[in-house]
Amino acid sequence: MTVPAPTLLPAAGPPHAHGVPGDEAPGDAARPLPALLAEVRAFLRERVLPLEPRVLQEEFRDVLPALRAVRAEAKARGLWAPHLPRSLGGLGLTLREYAEVSAVLGETPAGPYALNCQAPDVGNMELLHQFGTPEQQ
């Protein structure tokens, strides 16, 4: 007995394929995905991977000043919050694009934190954006 292969969604995906539904259209990122992935890899190699031994061996509070500097640089380089729409300071990636960026970030434990897309905060940001009061947003 053979099991049919699952059908794939169209390239654009369903309306909720965007990181946060209701904002920019899917694929409305500011730069092509291959260029973004190259930038993220370079940023990890240059700034995040050198901190990995400290992240793994030291108390978080002791590494936090260095991580804050890395996060500020990520924001300055335009790599901040890939899951959020550009209107909120994010990259406006589709869910598929964000998945590819996440795969790169997952190469180091500090990768998602460096770009402000670590669990569980990512989901909280999306929920607050969609359903939070103005003060919460």
Can you name each region flagged by the protein language model?
Residues 35-39, 80-83:
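Short low-complexity stretches enriched in small and charged residues
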Residues 1-32, 37:
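Intrinsic disorder at enzyme termini
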Residues 16, 49-137:
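Glycine-rich flavin
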Residues 33, 40, 44-45, 74:
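Short hydrophobic motif
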Residues 6, 45-46:
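Catalytic cores of phosphodiester-bond-cleaving enzymes
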